[in-house]
A protein has these predicted regions:
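N-terminal secretory signal peptides that target proteins for export/translocation
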Residues: 1-3
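Sec/Tat signal peptide C-region and signal peptidase I cleavage site
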Residues: 15-21
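Short beta-strand/loop motifs in extracellular/secreted proteins, especially
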Residues: 22, 39-41, 51
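Short secondary-structure boundary/capping segments within folded domains
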Residues: 31-35, 94
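Short, ordered, surface-exposed loop/turn motifs in non-cytosolic proteins
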Residues: 34-47
């Protein structure tokens, strides 16, 4: 349909608005759902000429305008209305959107009702195989993007119909080396009041079938939701692959580099000299995020115990692992970096070492650029005569393109009560006490940034990893000595290096025993730097699965008990 015809059609749909100003009314037909639906209606206005607006929402300078409103029991044909009072991002109000031509798309992120085991009843978006992504979740309703002319000053109603539904995602197939596992968790099912599952993507060693008597070390790779085992490619790189450049790494044909690295990993993994082991990536997407942070939480549930006492034993039995702490390791970056350290701290006897790269804040005195225990406001550094916005994201030269206020306001548009599925909301869901309404208590006011001291105190005692290690070193220290390995770039895009500095300060003071681990920094390295000083970040981030193997083998050699099986898996 041409732009002129699209605008003409929308002009016919426009109707006078008695309240004054522009309104955007979103509905769905009975063909899409005969039942009333709960969820979050999002409306995106995009200046981009191509692509779907739902994939153009972000907090940086290239992000497009989005508005959101909760709906409870929205019936077919009824309308969810966006008007000048609806909170939006980057412009806070529809009245502030410049008049002009846009492409509009609406989406309903569907919620279901959970009758939780703690007695609370909450409405949340259940993961449906996509890893808790509102713009890709199967079953979500959305409209076909179309051109509109927006004039906030005009008394009119722009009507948008949700005429499409995101289809189911087909499950990935198993291969000789990669297996996909799914179990129902008793603990999580009891907490959420409905069947809840944990999954894993398992990479088997070369010779697994040919050596039925072998028992293997288990290595847990933590990180964001893995649909399958990425970075492992049996086939050589595609010679006809069109090059896709990386703006972040300033590299041409980065997709070709990724394929080559994935194939190189396959060749090394199956080669004669690589230690045989099992690597698993955990699938623990949940109603809050694509990942649970692998610890027990008042809001997200007992994921720590479910993973370590249900999933890992099931994997070790099925895939013939050694099943002892000296033969388990964990590693990851960013979210996975925090998890690697957290599970080593909370389950110290279960792992023989953690390798935590660019971890999410491990000391809440440096929660990005916020000291949760001393600062009054997360968004602003206030002085007598001025206030300065706290940066949220920078590049390797320190140029800021987003503030903490930007990031959190976008989250508030995408979902109220911690339901955005984004970064600050999951931290809050994992670390906070449960509120009276069943949703996480806010660490700060999402609109203003004012910090809640009582919530911060709860965070400190339960999830501030450096504080917990300092508080409990007399009992934790003997179990952690030699196991902690931390890596971070000193120009981390999210300022995560600041918390690592504080962790290092504490760890270097430890005695009885000394922590005897590693803390290293990458010069001018951005997010995802993982300890490979000789490689650029663009390459080292593709080599996580092999980077720490030699150190793991050294730990096994130094710490395995006298009767340990050190031979069946070395073939």
């Amino acid at each position: 349909m041409s732009l002129v015809r699209s605008l003409a059609l929308l002009a016919l749909l426009a109707a006078p608005c008695p309240a004054g100003g522009l309104r955007i009314a979103v509905s769905f037909p009975a063909e899409r759902s005969a039942a009333a639906l709960d969820g979050r209606v999002l409306v995106i206005l995009s200046k981009e000429a191509e692509g779907e607006p739902r994939f153009q929402v972000r907090d940086g300078p290239t992000g497009q305008q989005v508005f959101g409103v909760d709906v409870d029991g929205l019936a077919p044909g009824d309308e969810a209305v966006i008007d000048a009072t609806t909170f939006g991002y980057p412009r806070a109000s529809l009245a502030d959107v410049p008049a002009g031509e846009y492409r509009v798309q609406a989406l309903l992120h569907r919620y279901e009702t959970f009758h939780r085991g703690d007695g609370h009843v909450v409405k949340m978006p259940m993961d449906r195989g996509e890893g808790q992504q509102w713009n890709r979740a199967p079953g979500n309703l959305l409209s076909t993007p179309r051109a509109v002319r927006v004039d906030p000053a005009r008394d009119a109603t722009l009507r948008v119909e949700l005429d499409r539904e995101i289809p189911p995602i087909p499950p990935p197939a198993d291969t000789k080396y990669i297996k996909h596992v799914r179990i129902q968790s008793e603990r999580l099912t009891a907490f959420w009041g409905r069947p809840m599952h944990l999954g894993a993507v398992v990479l088997l060693p070369e010779g697994f079938d040919e050596h039925p008597d072998a028992r293997y070390p288990l290595v847990v790779n933590h990180g964001h939701f893995p649909a399958t085992f990425g970075g492992f490619r049996e086939e050589p790189p595609d010679p006809d692959l069109a090059p896709d450049d990386s703006a972040r790494f300033r590299l041409e044909g980065y997709n070709r580099i990724q394929q080559q690295e994935a194939h190189d990993f396959y060749r090394r993994w199956t080669g004669p000299d690589f230690p045989r082991m099992v690597i698993c990536k955990i699938q623990h997407a949940n109603p809050f995020y694509d990942d649970s942070y692998a610890v027990n939480s008042e809001n997200v549930g007992p994921y720590g115990d479910a993973i370590h006492h249900e999933l890992i034993p099931a994997l070790e039995e099925r895939f013939r692992c050694l099943g002892e702490g000296w033969a388990r390791f964990t590693y990851g970056g960013s979210t996975g970096g925090w998890e690697a350290l957290a599970v080593q701290v909370h389950y110290p006897d279960m792992f023989n070492g953690c390798f935590a790269a660019c971890p999410d804040p491990i000391d809440f005195r440096a929660y990005c650029l916020v000291d949760l225990y001393a600062d009054e406001n997360a968004y602003w550094l206030d002085g007598a005569w001025k206030r300065v916005a706290r940066p949220g994201h920078r590049d390797w030269l320190g140029q800021v393109d987003s503030t903490l206020r930007d990031m959190n306001h976008l989250e508030l548009v995408l979902g109220t009560k911690g339901r955005s599925g984004q970064q600050f909301d999951i931290w809050e869901a994992v670390y906070s006490p449960c509120g009276a309404d069943g949703y996480p208590e806010r660490i700060w006011d999402k609109r203003t940034g004012v910090i809640d001291r009582d919530v911060a105190a709860y965070w400190r005692e339960n999830h501030d990893l450096v504080h917990i290690m300092r508080r409990d070193w007399a009992t934790l220290g003997p179990k952690l000595a030699g196991k902690i390995h931390l890596y971070c770039g000193d120009m981390d895009n999210y300022y995560l290096n600041n918390a690592v500095y504080l962790a290092e300060e504490f760890l270097e003071t430890t005695t009885a025993p000394h922590y005897a681990g590693v803390v290293e920094y990458g010069d001018r390295a951005e997010h995802c730097w993982n300890g490979a000083h000789e490689l650029p970040n663009a390459i080292s981030r593709l080599r996580y699965h092999t980077l720490y193997v030699d150190r793991m083998m050294a730990r096994i050699a130094a710490t395995a008990p006298a009767d340990a099986d050190l031979t069946s898996w070395r073939y």
